[in-house]
């Protein structure tokens, strides 16, 4: 693999890293999606500078490697992501975490799955749910006051730092019950995970409980609250 030999990296204009691994995965995914859905545009983190989404309602959102830092440094929490947006809403998603040997996908309400030992296992937010110990994933070990307010409101007892879109997956399964984030992520960071969590029965909104729609200017997301089916 490129992680073991021939990996190169550079810093993008937004001060985030990109590797030749990102670009190779991007090329593979884009080629396959063009074969599957030739009429649907593809918007990728690595090619977004060249894309215009004005008035675009149907498109793919791809993040070839979410968690490039982990990928470059031989850590495990990076993911490969593709989400299909129709009428500005997520209708299908695929997330693969190769180093953790985990894959998740969804294609409609009630159809969210994890591929485990060659089997398609339905996920519905109930895997480790304990109503007495509400557990959230977090972007940082240090919780900001505005996020702590939401934690208190939701009676969150524990939080664990986690990177990449894997956060959406572990909330969808019920390994964790939710996630709260300030405006930081771009649309390609969350589209696949949003679909998977939504189709597992969970919910993704902003801090004001508004639905998250796609095709926004500059691909920027607002604040986010993720809830598993058991908290909805």
Predicted feature residues:
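Short helix-loop capping/hinge motifs at secondary-structure junctions, enriched
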Residues: 110-121, 231-232
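Short loop->beta-strand "edge-of-pocket" segments that line small-molecule binding or catalytic clefts
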Residues: 126-145, 154-162
